[in-house]
Amino acid sequence: MKTIKVVAAVICDNMKEKNKIFATARGYGELKGGWEFPGGKIEAGETPQEALKREIMEELDTEIKVGDLIDTIEYGYPTFHLSMDCFWAEVTAGHLELKEAEAAKWLTKDQLNSVAGLPADITLIEKIRRNMDN
């Protein structure tokens, strides 16, 4: 089975306090409408952090500061295996303009389970919730 290596940004309102997290609803493909943390594929020669900055600029017209790695999620979809490095991130410039997603929300810790997340992203939710307690 093919493995796809991707990165995801768990964009928070403030990396120290982490009161709200930004999530988007996928705007294309077979997983359209599923809620996820924005990001994308790592291109040849890129570090995960470089890929994440590029993807967020492409998808949201926004510059971010990439923080700590939260986790690497390994998830087997029916047609491929996903390996996803998930990082904390914070907006440094721009206004989170949706270029590929169909919707977006800022979610508090208690709202994280209120959207229909994609399976790989759901596995990350509890770890994010624990980090939002800090």
Per-region residue spans from a language model:
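Conserved hydrophobic "DFG−1" position in protein kinase catalytic cores
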Residues: 11-12, 23, 89-91, 106
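Conserved Nudix-box catalytic region and its N-terminal flanking loop in Nudix hydrolases
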Residues: 18-58
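Active-site-adjacent beta-strand/loop module that shapes the phosphate/pyrophosphate-binding cleft
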Residues: 63, 72-95, 103-105
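Hydrophobic packing within well-folded, soluble alpha/beta domains
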Residues: 48-57, 69, 87, 104
